[in-house]
């Protein structure tokens, strides 16, 4: 059964930009290069946002975001995480860190201390396994797959702790027009508002323009 499952999920060939890749090494390099190009930043141009009047945090809120990490804060974030997710390159699931917290907490807190003092971490900490999940049966083109990254447990924990800190203040700096990814707001509200706008135009026999953008935010 395991061998059959592996055969069904193996990727012997793939089409990238209209070109078929069949050799294992070519498939690996082709996929890696495609996503590297997709996710790379154009260093020649950056948007100038200095003239925008953006909401900002108070000095106290900014300082709170940069406080040293406490054991209670890290442990609380760890216990909130789903322990059953697939392990990353380090081979440890989140459940391992949860169950063995009393034994590993000193080393983990030392990692958080180094990160706080140096504002950086070892490159190996966020090493990932890139896994392609087919969006439909018979997927052949790279666009027919959805990539997911299997991250190590410690990197997930670090991200969780930082996210918990940001939750406390993010509502102050995110526009009230954004409905997604903010606690207390529902993405469905945006669809309802769009329908109301279209309905209003039709009733008043007015013309309008709606722009649907497939975009995402990033933090540099």
Regions found by a protein language model. Give the residues of each.
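Residues immediately flanking
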Residues: 1, 89, 134-136, 153-154, ...
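Conserved catalytic palm subdomain of right-hand nucleotidyl-transferase polymerases, strongest
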Residues: 12-15, 85-92, 141-150, 189-220
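Short, contiguous clusters of charged residues that form electrostatic/catalytic patches at enzyme active sites
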Residues: 33, 76, 110, 160, ...
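Structural signal for hydrophobic packing residues in well-ordered secondary-structure cores
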Residues: 39, 43, 116, 166-170, ...
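Conserved short loop/turn motifs at secondary-structure junctions
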Residues: 92-100, 178-185, 212-218
